[in-house]
């Protein structure tokens, strides 16, 4: 509770990794759907 800065950095890192994972899943879904429809 005395040092909230490392916790804030960890939360931001988890948030960016979550967004990167969602973006990767979205790209894979688009490529997979285009592969199916073509």
Swiss-Prot record:
Complexes and interactors: PSII is composed of 1 copy each of membrane proteins PsbA, PsbB, PsbC, PsbD, PsbE, PsbF, PsbH, PsbI, PsbJ, PsbK, PsbL, PsbM, PsbT, PsbX, PsbY, PsbZ, Psb30/Ycf12, at least 3 peripheral proteins of the oxygen-evolving complex and a large number of cofactors. It forms dimeric complexes.
Keyword Plastid found: yes
InterPro entries: PSII_PsbL (IPR003372), PSII_PsbL_sf (IPR037266)
One GO cellular component term: photosystem II reaction center
Biological source species: Chlamydomonas moewusii (Chlamydomonas eugametos)
Gene for this chain: psbL
Protein known as: Photosystem II reaction center protein L
Function: One of the components of the core complex of photosystem II (PSII). PSII is a light-driven water:plastoquinone oxidoreductase that uses light energy to abstract electrons from H(2)O, generating O(2) and a proton gradient subsequently used for ATP formation. It consists of a core antenna complex that captures photons, and an electron transfer chain that converts photonic excitation into a charge separation. This subunit is found at the monomer-monomer interface and is required for correct PSII assembly and/or dimerization.
Pfam family, one: PsbL
Family statement: Belongs to the PsbL family.
